[in-house]
C-alpha cells in the first residue's frame, strides 16, 4: 500500500473534527432582500445577502484522488473557460493511476458558483467594498467593471455564473493510530473509495 497510498490517506480519516468548515459557496444567489439569514446546527449562516448560499460540514470524510507533486491544474486569471456548462476546476490534481510516482491522497473539495464573463469566457474579478463594491451596490456589473479595469482585462458587461471546484490536499488533523482507516473502510461493501473514478 505504501507505494500507491499516501500516509495521510489512512491516518486522516476525517477533517474539520472540531470546527465546521465551509464546503459550498454560491455567489449567484446573493443580493436577495426577500431571504433571511438561516443558520445550520453549528451556528453557521446558510444564507447571507452579501454572500449567497453556503454549506458547512464537520468531521467529514475526505475525497480521494491520485496526486504527484508538480502535476496539478491551477486556473490563471484571464484563462479561457472551455465549457461554461461544465464544472471548472480552479485547482486540483491531474495525475492518474498510470503515473508511477502518484499516490492516492485525501482532499477537501471546496465547491461553489462564481461570476464569469459570458462573452470572453473567463472568471471575473469583482470589487466587494467601496463605492462600486458589490456589498454596497449589489450590482454585479458595476462591481466587476471596476475590478476588471484594475486587472487590465476587458469586460463585456455580460455576467453569468459557473460552478467551480478547488481541491485542497489534507496534511493536518492526523488521528490517533486506533482511529485510522482499516481494510474494510476502503475495501468493504460500503467502502469510502470510488474505485472506478480512481481508475481500477
Where would I find each of the regions flagged by the language model?
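C-type cytochrome heme-c attachment and multiheme electron-transfer modules
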Residues: 1-200
